[in-house]
């Protein structure tokens, strides 16, 4: 039997197991307690708990009968609004199992539907409102038409704060017999950008190769540049060894397939940890922003990164000059 994805294995099953989202949990608990609930719209970036919360709500509403009373659909997977209509019609025509007053339809990626399809969805929601409630999941609320928004209680889901993600990752690692270093958690958080699903997946891939997970193991697992490579590039360039720095950069680009934008992100991450004064860090950050902008405008990656390394050499020269004792007159 194939091993479960850790994200599914450790998916919360109750409100108490959900980390963060206290205000959302409080309001949903009231719906469960009263037995009366409007249609819901959960929106926010990927991996922020929208699907998890919808499934937790289903479990809290229906207990052991949650599967029988819940229909999960994905707007991207279905072959049009007519398929969704027929599936909802078939699902809604039977009474809820147990003592539940209504059934539940969870529609993921609702914001990927066209405006016409959403208008049709609005009518479906109205037709079956007597015994069916909808939970719509979306990344962007701005892509949902107003007539649907006005019929829903709207909940915003935000990326998980670092300290809460760290707690969860440490718990999962300990449960799996894996030691995860603090610098590894830092990099996982930066790479996942608060996406809990992505963070857990990175941890699982990293743990598959090494039971002691540090920053470099994470970088390899996520196909990111190793921090040690970036530090080496920084040091070579700052020391004025431009040719070696450029050779290292070209190796990473053409042998390991690192893209220009990935270089920029990796430099930005490691810059914070460099033992440079704040003024120098600000100068390098401004230089990175300049190169990043040019890359987004279609400039040649190798030329722009070579320019960046050359400018680092000039910055390093200024640092060394400033550290020399003043000449005696």
Swiss-Prot record:
Annotated ATP binding sites: 44-51
InterPro entries in alphabetical order: AAA+_ATPase (IPR003593), ATPase_AAA_core (IPR003959), DNA_pol3_clamp-load_cplx_C (IPR008921), DNA_Rep/Repair_Clamp_Loader (IPR050238), P-loop_NTPase (IPR027417), Rep_factor-C_ssu_arc (IPR023748), Rep_factorC_C (IPR013748), RFC_lid (IPR047854)
Classification via SUPFAM superfamilies: P-loop containing nucleoside triphosphate hydrolases, post-AAA+ oligomerization domain-like
GO CC term (a single one): DNA replication factor C complex
Record bears the keyword Nucleotide-binding: yes
BP GO terms, sorted: DNA repair; DNA-templated DNA replication
HAMAP family: RfcS (MF_01509)
Functional summary from the UniProt entry: Part of the RFC clamp loader complex which loads the PCNA sliding clamp onto DNA.
Oligomeric and partner information: Heteromultimer composed of small subunits (RfcS) and large subunits (RfcL).
Entry's family note: Belongs to the activator 1 small subunits family. RfcS subfamily.
Name of this protein: Replication factor C small subunit 1
Native species: Pyrobaculum islandicum (strain DSM 4184 / JCM 9189 / GEO3)
């Amino acid at each position: 039997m194939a091993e479960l994805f850790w994200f599914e294995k450790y998916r919360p099953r109750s409100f108490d197991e959900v980390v963060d989202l206290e205000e959302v949990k409080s309001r949903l608990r009231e719906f469960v307690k009263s037995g009366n609930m409007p249609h819901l719209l959960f929106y926010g970036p990927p991996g922020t708990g929208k699907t998890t919360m919808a499934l937790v709500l289903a479990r809290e509403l229906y207990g052991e009968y949650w599967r029988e009373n819940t229909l999960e659909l994905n707007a991207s997977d279905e072959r049009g609004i007519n398929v969704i209509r027929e599936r909802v019609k078939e699902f809604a025509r039977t009474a809820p199992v147990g003592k539940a007053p209504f059934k539940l339809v969870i529609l993921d990626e609702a914001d990927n539907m066209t405006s016409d399809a959403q208008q049709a969805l609005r009518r479906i929601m109205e037709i079956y409102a007597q015994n069916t409630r909808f939970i719509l999941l979306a990344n962007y609320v701005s892509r949902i038409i107003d007539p649907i928004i006005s019929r829903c209680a709207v909940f915003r889901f935000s990326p998980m704060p670092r300290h809460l993600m760290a707690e969860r990752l440490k718990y999962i690692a300990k449960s799996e017999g894996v030691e995860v270093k603090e610098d590894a958690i830092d990099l996982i958080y930066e790479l996942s950008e608060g996406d809990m699903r992505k963070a857990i997946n990175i941890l699982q891939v990293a743990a598959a190769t090494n039971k002691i997970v540090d920053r470099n193991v994470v970088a390899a697992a996520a196909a990111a540049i190793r921090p040690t490579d970036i530090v080496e590039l920084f040091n070579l360039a700052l020391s004025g060894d431009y040719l070696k720095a450029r050779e290292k950069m070209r190796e990473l680009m053409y042998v390991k397939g690192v893209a220009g934008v990935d270089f920029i992100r990796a430099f930005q991450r490691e810059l914070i940890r460099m033992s440079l004064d704040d003024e120098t860090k600000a100068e390098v950050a401004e230089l990175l922003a300049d190169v990043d902008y040019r890359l987004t405008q279609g400039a040649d990656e190798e030329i722009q990164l070579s320019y960046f390394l050359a400018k680092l050499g000039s910055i390093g020269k200024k640092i060394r000059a400033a550290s020399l004792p003043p000449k005696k007159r």
